[in-house]
């Protein structure tokens, strides 16, 4: 099949989308997916939690069942959020050739990507993304700001400054959220925070252009995030959908997450699920597109340091909960998803099988 260039300015106006973007009928959204049932996920008042250290049982149950909840009273300045969206709009309004100055290279997880057209030739997502690394490690205080100038030019300095501030704020917020999750697991409140304090987060700006045939394609296909934690702010268009459990899957029951301007959606990824020895869930989700308007979202992925070994705290391993995953580093899992495997519904299972084959063992008894 001939290669296709994802130029949002052109494709969003086409009546028929290219075949590479058409998903199989059993994976594509139904024509009436704009009215799917909403999922009820708990809301954590973060300011109240930080003051008291207590959470509701509904939060712990959500982490065990599907790994989704929302946080409010999080301390993120609404003016910073508004400017982050304004810069997102400004970036995606630029000509394709200009955005491609920051083109994502094969095997890398940062840069501009237009629908993965360079990596795959079918079931392409109807989106373009801009991803960049950020770090709280000493010497990296200007990492994001410098990246925008180095990759795109001096005229992007303000944009880089905005996202530097945004990443700094989101790093602090994500570390606070790890305390919520530690309490949900019955651990000491700060027990997981140190694991991520010197980590390698990634920030992503998502743009889903309008599509004349939204029932044939997806903005992001069904997948579990390979990362540890995802903190998502979605605009008022909506499009995030979750498959919360096996019962919903059997009924084909995707559930919509209603946008909430004052909240961040938190979802647990595969790496965090492994860190909890499977006590917390990483569940399937996807993004649908809109037939009339563009959708944008700001996504922050919390990750440990690349060389940090992901291994559960001893308190989470016992006779009733034997080791569910082998030890691995975040670098190993990241490289697996960038070089060997397209993240989907079975990424972690495929990764575990790959580790076992590479290391020459069949069980986890050694752990």
UniProtKB/Swiss-Prot annotation:
Name the keywords, alphabetized. Answer: Dioxygenase, Iron, Metal-binding, Oxidoreductase, Plant defense
Per its UniProt record, the required cofactor names are: Fe(2+); L-ascorbate
- What binding details are noted for the cofactor? Binds 1 Fe(2+) ion per subunit.
Q: Which GO terms describe its biological process?
A: defense response; flower development; gibberellin biosynthetic process; gibberellin metabolic process; regulation of growth; response to light stimulus; unidimensional cell growth
What are this entry's molecular-function GO terms?
A: 2-oxoglutarate-dependent dioxygenase activity; gibberellin 20-oxidase activity; metal ion binding
* InterPro entries registered for this protein in UniProt: DIOX_N, IPNS-like_FE2OG_OXY, IPNS-like_sf, Iron_ascorbate_oxido_reductase, Oxoglu/Fe-dep_dioxygenase_dom
Catalysed reaction, written as an equation: gibberellin A12 + 2 2-oxoglutarate + 3 O2 + H(+) = gibberellin A9 + 2 succinate + 3 CO2 + 2 H2O; gibberellin A53 + 2 2-oxoglutarate + 3 O2 + H(+) = gibberellin A20 + 2 succinate + 3 CO2 + 2 H2O
What SUPFAM superfamilies does this protein's entry cite? Answer: Clavaminate synthase-like (SSF51197)
Q: Which residues bind 2-oxoglutarate?
A: 208, 295, 297
Top class in the EC scheme: oxidoreductase
Q: Which residues form the Fe2OG dioxygenase domain?
A: 198-304
Q: Does the keyword Heme apply?
A: no
Q: From which domain of life does this come?
A: Eukaryota
Which positions are annotated as binding Fe cation?
223, 225, 285
E.C. number(s) listed in UniProt: 1.14.11.-
Q: Which family does it belong to?
A: Belongs to the iron/ascorbate-dependent oxidoreductase family.
Function, please? Key oxidase enzyme in the biosynthesis of gibberellin. Controls the elongation of the vegetative shoot and plant height by the regulation of active gibberellin levels.
**Other noteworthy facts:** Plants silencing GA20OX3 exhibit a semi-dwarf phenotype, and show enhanced resistance against the fungal pathogen Magnaporthe oryzae and the bacterial pathogen Xanthomonas oryzae pv. oryzae, and increased expression of defense-related genes. Plants over-expressing GA20OX3 exhibit a elongated shoot and internode phenotype, and show enhanced susceptibility against the fungal pathogen Magnaporthe oryzae and the bacterial pathogen Xanthomonas oryzae pv. oryzae, and accumulation of the bioactive gibberellins GA1 and GA4.
Q: What is this protein called?
A: Gibberellin 20 oxidase 3
Q: Which organism is it from?
A: Oryza sativa subsp. japonica
What lineage does the source organism belong to?
Eukaryota, Viridiplantae, Streptophyta, Embryophyta, Tracheophyta
What gene does this protein come from? GA20OX3
